[in-house]
């Protein structure tokens, strides 16, 4: 089994849906989350606050540097994500398709690196 990150993408240009559309979307996502959980592939999921309230932290130099706002200056951003434990990429794509339909936005699929083997 491999863990996959399913990232929900949106744009700061996207108009806020009407309240009834937003409620239906939340209901669809809750149903999708319940399906992930009931089939045992759910690891974790959450939505993110808007990208414009992010803080970038760079501790690579002698002084800590912090910058308000997202790392990438782009209109597109990650609005939420699921972490799943799946057999293969085909399964991840199938789940991403369901997640995309539920949240009404594109979903990016990325496998996570496997845990390193313990030192002997």
Ranges and model annotations:
Residues 1-120:
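Conserved, structured core segments of small domains
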């Amino acid at each position: 089994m491999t863990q996959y990150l399913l990232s929900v993408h949106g744009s700061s240009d996207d108009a806020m849906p009407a309240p009834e559309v937003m409620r239906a979307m939340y209901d669809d996502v809750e149903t999708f989350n319940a399906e992930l959980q009931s089939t045992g592939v759910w690891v974790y999921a959450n939505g993110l606050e808007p990208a414009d309230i992010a803080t970038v932290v760079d501790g690579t130099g002698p002084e800590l540097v912090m910058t308000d706002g997202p790392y990438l200056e782009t209109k597109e951003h990650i609005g939420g994500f699921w972490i799943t434990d799946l057999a293969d990429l085909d399964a991840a794509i199938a789940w991403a398709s369901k997640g995309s339909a539920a949240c009404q936005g594109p979903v990016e699929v990325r496998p996570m690196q496997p845990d390193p083997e313990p030192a002997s």
